[in-house]
């Protein structure tokens, strides 16, 4: 299944706020209206919607998300927590959380078009897994810095998570540590996502 490129507002009206996909927010009460129209949700649908939230927020294909779930399942610790850490430490998401892009699709474009350096080297793979002590900068070119400055000039998003530090005048971000789960930028029940996939196999 390919990455979603359809109307974004339609998704947030059904699933709630997805800051990685769009900075728009559903109107107050729209969740309640949707629920009353559709009646009581089945457990399957609840798990499916949590999975879809994760997929659309981080801009993943179904295959990519399944791959991350499998990697998380083999790691030590809670599968759900590890899954969120893997997704949050992607380069495209780190750029978004730093405010260097207003959405994750926007961050992905910066990476694909070779505007971003990690530790002084161009990285053009959005799924690159960032590590503690990584230094993320814009290329020293007017076009690259102008794109990021536009994001800095946009209305600010949520508070900067503790695992990141931004130095905006240098167009630089630092990864201080692996993210703590309480700083994940999405309201999600990750256990339902893991349950969804465990019931598919």
UniProtKB/Swiss-Prot annotation:
Subcellular location as annotated: Plastid, Chloroplast
Gene3D superfamilies according to UniProt: Ribosomal Protein S4 Delta 41, Chain A, domain 1, RNA-binding S4 domain
InterPro entries referenced in this protein's UniProt entry, alphabetically: Ribosomal_uS4 (IPR022801), Ribosomal_uS4_bac-type (IPR005709), Ribosomal_uS4_CS (IPR018079), Ribosomal_uS4_N (IPR001912), S4_RNA-bd (IPR002942), S4_RNA-bd_sf (IPR036986)
A Gene Ontology BP annotation from the UniProt entry: ribosomal small subunit biogenesis
Entry keywords, A to Z: Chloroplast, Plastid, Ribonucleoprotein, Ribosomal protein, RNA-binding, rRNA-binding
SUPFAM superfamilies, A to Z: Alpha-L RNA-binding motif
GO cellular component: chloroplast; small ribosomal subunit
Region (Disordered): 15-44
Domain of life: Eukaryota
Function summary: One of the primary rRNA binding proteins, it binds directly to 16S rRNA where it nucleates assembly of the body of the 30S subunit.
HAMAP family: Ribosomal_uS4_B
Annotated family: Belongs to the universal ribosomal protein uS4 family.
PANTHER family referenced in this protein's UniProt entry, alphabetically: 30S 40S RIBOSOMAL PROTEIN (PTHR11831), SMALL RIBOSOMAL SUBUNIT PROTEIN US4M (PTHR11831:SF4)
Quaternary structure note: Part of the 30S ribosomal subunit. Contacts protein S5. The interaction surface between S4 and S5 is involved in control of translational fidelity.
Protein name: Small ribosomal subunit protein uS4c
Species per Swiss-Prot/TrEMBL record: Daucus carota (Wild carrot)
